[in-house]
Amino acid sequence: MRLRHKPYAMDRINEYSHIVIGNPEERAGSWKEVFGNEQPIHIEVGTGRGRFMYDMAKANPHINYIGIEKFTSVVVDALDKLIEEELPNLKLINKDAEDLTVFFAKGEIDRVYLNFSDPWPKKRHTKRRLTYKTFLRNYEEVLVEGGEIHFKTDNQGLFEYSLMSMAEYGMLLTYLSLDLHNSDFEGNIMTEYEEKFSSKGHRIYRVEAKYRTEPMQ
């Protein structure tokens, strides 16, 4: 996907620095102070234009959310939603998720969302997939003990790879759907991509995976 350059993006982001948090590494261990409360914190890695995080934050004011998106021209669209209607329980980070363990202290996050991540289908790009073992290790480091990953995609190959990667890492798969929109799952909040792909008849895959608190026997 070609991203359209938006020359105003950085100025807009800098103007609303209370929403798009600059230097997030300086906030590690103090995100509850940023939000001003003790509510649990959920993050989305690759938040895109922010529809999912926005709708989640609006539906769940008792939870704090942070959307992480590395592309400035994309995260500014998420910011524009919040300029129109600011939600006190939603912040954004315009950085690469590879640095996740620098942004958050150990055990600071309660849940990680991965929605319609780039599948990186070529074998030589396997390490870039957000469910590759190094990313799983980073999520585990910032999550509370027994923390969860909730993952959705329309890409069967990526889904199968992710199930294998999570299982090999020793995670527990606590929920699995091979056709989310025709399942009994309640309360699904869609992303922009999810709405687009499902309207074309694409099957949506979903898994919830939990880190073990005790080593496998």
UniProtKB/Swiss-Prot annotation:
<feature type="binding site">
    <location>
        <position position="96"/>
    </location>
    <ligand>
        <name>S-adenosyl-L-methionine</name>
    </ligand>
</feature>
<keyword id="KW-0819">tRNA processing</keyword>
<protein>
    <recommendedName>
        <fullName>tRNA (guanine-N(7)-)-methyltransferase</fullName>
        <ecNumber>2.1.1.33</ecNumber>
    </recommendedName>
</protein>
<comment type="pathway">
    <text>tRNA modification; N(7)-methylguanine-tRNA biosynthesis.</text>
</comment>
<dbReference type="GO" id="GO:0036265">
    <property type="term" value="P:RNA (guanine-N7)-methylation"/>
</dbReference>
<dbReference type="GO" id="GO:0043527">
    <property type="term" value="C:tRNA methyltransferase complex"/>
</dbReference>
<feature type="binding site">
    <location>
        <position position="44"/>
    </location>
    <ligand>
        <name>S-adenosyl-L-methionine</name>
    </ligand>
</feature>
<dbReference type="InterPro" id="IPR055361">
    <property type="entry name" value="tRNA_methyltr_TrmB_bact"/>
</dbReference>
<dbReference type="GO" id="GO:0008176">
    <property type="term" value="F:tRNA (guanine(46)-N7)-methyltransferase activity"/>
</dbReference>
<dbReference type="Pfam" id="PF02390">
    <property type="entry name" value="Methyltransf_4"/>
</dbReference>
<feature type="binding site">
    <location>
        <position position="118"/>
    </location>
    <ligand>
        <name>S-adenosyl-L-methionine</name>
    </ligand>
</feature>
<feature type="binding site">
    <location>
        <position position="69"/>
    </location>
    <ligand>
        <name>S-adenosyl-L-methionine</name>
    </ligand>
</feature>
<dbReference type="InterPro" id="IPR003358">
    <property type="entry name" value="tRNA_(Gua-N-7)_MeTrfase_Trmb"/>
</dbReference>
<feature type="binding site">
    <location>
        <begin position="191"/>
        <end position="194"/>
    </location>
    <ligand>
        <name>substrate</name>
    </ligand>
</feature>
<keyword id="KW-0949">S-adenosyl-L-methionine</keyword>
<feature type="binding site">
    <location>
        <position position="122"/>
    </location>
    <ligand>
        <name>substrate</name>
    </ligand>
</feature>
<keyword id="KW-0489">Methyltransferase</keyword>
<feature type="active site">
    <location>
        <position position="118"/>
    </location>
</feature>
<dbReference type="GO" id="GO:0030488">
    <property type="term" value="P:tRNA methylation"/>
</dbReference>
<comment type="similarity">
    <text>Belongs to the class I-like SAM-binding methyltransferase superfamily. TrmB family.</text>
</comment>
<feature type="binding site">
    <location>
        <position position="154"/>
    </location>
    <ligand>
        <name>substrate</name>
    </ligand>
</feature>
<comment type="function">
    <text>Catalyzes the formation of N(7)-methylguanine at position 46 (m7G46) in tRNA.</text>
</comment>
<dbReference type="InterPro" id="IPR029063">
    <property type="entry name" value="SAM-dependent_MTases_sf"/>
</dbReference>
<keyword id="KW-0808">Transferase</keyword>
